[in-house]
Amino acid sequence: MRVVVTGWTGQVVQAMLERVPAGVEVVALRRPEFDLAAPKTVAPALRSAKPDVIVNAAAYTAVDQAESEPELALRVNGEAAGEAARAAAALGVPMIQISTDYVFDGTLGRPYREDDPVGPISAYGASKLAGEQAVAAATENHAILRTAWVYSPFGKNFVRTMLRLAETRDEIGVVADQHGCPTSALGIADAIFAVARNLTDRPNEAALRGIFHMVAQGEAAWADVAEAIFAEREALGGAPVRVKRIATADYPTPASRPANSRLDSARLAEIHHVRLPQWQGALSSCVRRLLTSQ
């Protein structure tokens, strides 16, 4: 199975390149030949890569910056996703689109299911929703995988930021009134490969297509995640760091974040037989890897 992925520098693609299963070849497209900011480059690059399945993990992910350049976010996350899906349809191959919890407004009192109403409250969220809609309109043979609170040993993410701040501080303020599912990019990579295999091996099963939520088991506030990071760091000999639990209002940002980013992944488990691990164990492994590799 030849998996062609977009988003060369992103956490998910770096994780996929590390976790390639036997019998799978991963081709990661990169600029300048493939540039989501220039959507007309998308189809030619995908055609030349000769995929069995396309995974669009590339995205404009600067959530706050998107508020000041929404057109660019929409072009990258919306228009280019549609171009990729049209290319997949023309090639007759499945398309996997990676999406986000930010398509919801965060007001629901339980974890979001796939059929709950969407309502993004940021330019980034709106652009990702546009991407979902463009993919669904362009090809029936798709799976849209929504994930949330992604971290990994790669790139910029919450775990690496907390560890960096801990080097110079003994107390760090962290938001305690946003709740979600911290999800390792390594677990996401494994899930993507499983879904890709299902789509390619069982092309006539319509149930395998559509929207699926893909997050680790369990839930937490950002402050809980920070406390778990610092506890692991301290267990490895680091100095104690105290988490000051603050409200979202105490840490204003240009883009609004959903207060509830919890996603229900039951459908992914039921249909694709994919279940990501509990967030605590995966987080511990990530922190240990980062600290012991220094």
What positions do the PLM features span?
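Mid/C-terminal beta-alpha module of Rossmann-like enzyme folds, strongest
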Residues: 191, 198-254
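NAD(P)H-binding glycine-rich loop region in Rossmannoid oxidoreductase-like domains
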Residues: 39-78
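NAD(P)-cofactor binding segment of oxidoreductase domains
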Residues: 68-96
